[in-house]
Amino acid sequence: MRLRVDLLPDSHYPDVALVIDVLRATTTAVTLLEQGAAELLLTRTTEAALAVRETVPDVLLAGERGGLTIPGFDLGNSPVEVSGGAVAGRRVVMTTTNGTIAAHRAAQTARHVVLAALVNAHAVARHALAVASEEIAIVCAGTDGRVGLDDVYAAGVIAEYLLALGDFQVDDGARIALTMRRGGGDPGEALRSSGHGATLARLGLSSDVDYAAQLSTSRLIPTLVPGDDVPAGALRFLAG
């Protein structure tokens, strides 16, 4: 079995893709589904999210650009904001600067796509090992097209879990992520010291960074579930 870490999204995933945008999209996605959202519909663009609402009027819109809530949307991209339970039973359409785009990239070819974060790191590692047949790829979303320390650290945490569970052929990306994990301090330190962590702190969103640094507090696995009933331009993720 191969274990691969892409420091930025690639275009070919033959088997399992674990998509990470730890600050904050995939952490928020886990939280939305954990708080009872019926389903999560990820879109690449704001326009696509608004188009979904035209066809499915009862959805909630969640998303950010530049770290801030998109004007006219119901929610931002804050795991702290969505942890209050107001999303229970609702369909949520989500678009973010980096994470939802990475999910769409992975979904072009991967047989299994899962949203991964530190909060569900152990659960997604076990799930990936259970469903993979040839390769597990950990896909870092990055920040505005550049490698993000926060995602690489989180990838290293998941890679470390996987190596404790099975034998793998490890690529250089995985070695880089493991080195970052082992030398990066605890999760809070690593995320706060990242460029994106610092940006969120400047925006007054340090509580989101602290939330995202929690390790394996959730067993929820947001899993891509395609279907003819999924609105155009969206990917449907359900709680697994």
From Swiss-Prot:
The prosthetic group or cofactor this protein requires is:
Mg(2+)
Q: Which SUPFAM superfamilies match?
A: ComB-like
Identify the domain of life: Bacteria
EC number(s) per UniProt?
3.1.3.71
Q: Which reaction does it catalyse?
A: (2R)-O-phospho-3-sulfolactate + H2O = (2R)-3-sulfolactate + phosphate
NCBIfam families, A to Z: PRK14100.1
Q: What is the designated name of this protein?
A: Probable 2-phosphosulfolactate phosphatase
Question: Whose protein is this, by species?
Answer: Deinococcus radiodurans (strain ATCC 13939 / DSM 20539 / JCM 16871 / CCUG 27074 / LMG 4051 / NBRC 15346 / NCIMB 9279 / VKM B-1422 / R1)
